[in-house]
Amino acid sequence: MASFATIAAVQPYSAVKGLGGSSLTGAKLFIKPSRQSFKPKSTRAGAVVAKYGDKSVYFDLEDLGNTTGQWDLYGSDAPSPYNPLQSKFFETFAAPFTKRGLLLKFLILGGGSLLTYVSASSTGDVLPIKRGPQEKPKLGPRGKL
């Protein structure tokens, strides 16, 4: 457990409750920090060097596969395994949606048309004034309305 001197040194002008008066509304006792201040030890100055690969080699002409990446993994000269009709369909109809702006316009138009359809097919008797009275009116004292 930390001693009182350590707490006073770390927290300058800390208030201690409950030392004077009642324990509920005790007077605060202010403690001055000790003359001994906490100073970090001197830091060493030096250049920061990032390590990449083995022995800080950034580009290796002898090993271009690891330097530039394995491009053979992704490119293939083999024919497409998909049906040509399916490929043509997706190239034709999905091409406009490759850009963000066109996709956003499509979503806005779709959302607007959905909102229009829902509002047109909803019933208009939502407000009480449109629905009219729901219960039979109560008769007055002489049996009249």
From Swiss-Prot:
GO biological process, one term: photosynthesis
Keywords linked to the UniProt accession: Chloroplast, Membrane, Photosynthesis, Photosystem I, Plastid, Thylakoid, Transit peptide, Transmembrane, Transmembrane helix
Domain of life: Eukaryota
Main location: plastid
Transmembrane spans: 102-122
Localisation: Plastid, Chloroplast thylakoid membrane
Membrane topology category: Single-pass membrane protein
Interval spanned by the transit peptide: 1-50
InterPro entries: PSI_PsaH
PANTHER family according to UniProt: PHOTOSYSTEM I REACTION CENTER SUBUNIT VI, CHLOROPLASTIC, PHOTOSYSTEM I REACTION CENTER SUBUNIT VI-2, CHLOROPLASTIC
Family, similarity comment: Belongs to the psaH family.
Function: Possible role could be the docking of the LHC I antenna complex to the core complex.
Protein name according to UniProt: Photosystem I reaction center subunit VI, chloroplastic
Organism: Brassica campestris
Lineage start: Eukaryota, Viridiplantae, Streptophyta, Embryophyta, Tracheophyta
